[in-house]
Amino acid sequence: MAHFPGFGQSLLYGYPVYVFGDCVQADWCPISGGLCSARLHRHALLATCPEHQITWDPIDGRVVSSALQYLIPRLPSFPTQRTTRTLKVLTPPTTATTPKVPPSFFHAVKKHTPFRNNCLELTLGEQLPAMSFPDPGLRPQNVYTIWGCSVVCLYLYQLSPPMTWPLIPHVIFCHPEQLGAFLTRVPTKRLEELLYKIFLSTGAIIILPENCFPTTLFQPTRAPAIQAPWHTGLLPCQKEIVTPGLIWTFTDGSPMISGPCPKEGQPSLVVQSSTFIFQQFQTKASHPAFLLSHKLIQYSSFHSLHLLFEEYSTVPFSLLFNEKGANVSDDEPRGGPQPPTGGQIAESSV
């Protein structure tokens, strides 16, 4: 399907791009100030000009790889506004500082959710559907918690610029093949560029599975993982659940919050909740307005759920930021409620 030449928006980020022929979208090369090649991928996370051998960030114009590393143009949205005056010689970009996270934090993480039995396992039970994600433009959101003083993003689902994140995570758990489930036909190299850009812009510690997704741009933290990727999307529509945002559980007892179920054949946006919520409301399912009144959740502009907790109670604070509490020989969780058992769906009238 071809488009008429003209201006449009990036399918992934929404920044201004120029559309020309055969559904190809590209950005303007910072060196020449014009379209150098039609081979720029429309889903490119980092734009590349093969003619000038330069790679740059389409969001802020920062040159990532070039002999002219620090000749960074600040390009206006439209080429008629772009002149040689837009090229400015800037100082080298500052390197993002990695937050100081004590070793006890990583030790506690390996023993508690989402790490179970010293392995990063699925937290969504066994109910993985055999369906595709219905809308390529719809992205599930991240699951944010606060461990001590560090904001943790359990899984990297929201693929958007950092300025749109509700919280800037210090630690990110990520399975690259899960990202690939929501970015169809995107090479793994592009996924690496995404993680690398997040690493540069936030300074977050990125935790990837061992023996998976070898990286060349940066060296992330590795952790044991037997986690299966989501090749086919999210949970299917649940007919018995008619109210968006009900709290329910899977067969493994993991407490969850389900988002809207538009219609049969489409998935429900489901994110993991804290056992703290389940301990408070395990006898009934609650309407999102009830949870909002208790400041346990909030809606985003995409009408999906963000979980903002004061704590993630399955991980005792003493294990996170107390060096003496990190006993390697102790494999049992100390303190904090244990994940409940039973997978019955409980509903209540709202």
From Swiss-Prot:
GO biological process, one term: positive regulation of DNA-templated transcription
Region of interest called Homodimerization, as start-end residue ranges on this chain: 116-145, 213-248
Residue ranges, annotated region (Transactivation): 289-322
Domain of life: Viruses
Region described as Interaction with CREBBP C-terminus: spans on this chain: 312-319
Residues recorded as bearing Phosphoserine in the entry: S300, S301
GO molecular function list: DNA binding; SH3 domain binding; zinc ion binding
Region (Interaction with IKBKG) residue spans: 106-111
Assigned GO CC terms: host cell cytoplasm; host cell nucleus
Function, as annotated: Transcriptional activator that activates both the viral long terminal repeat (LTR) and cellular promoters via activation of CREB, NF-kappa-B, SRF and AP-1 pathways. Binds to two 21 bp repeat elements located within the LTRs, referred to as Tax-responsive element (TRE). Binding to TRE requires the interaction with CREB1 and CREBBP. Activation of NF-kappa-B leads to up-regulation of the expression of gene promoters containing NFkB motifs like IL8 or BCL2L1. Inhibits the action of p53/TP53 and MYCB. All these functions could lead to the possible occurrence of lymphoproliferative disorders.
Family membership noted in the UniProt record: Belongs to the deltaretrovirus Tax protein family.
The protein's name: Protein Tax-3
Species assigned in the record: Human T-cell leukemia virus 3 (strain Pyl43) (HTLV-3)
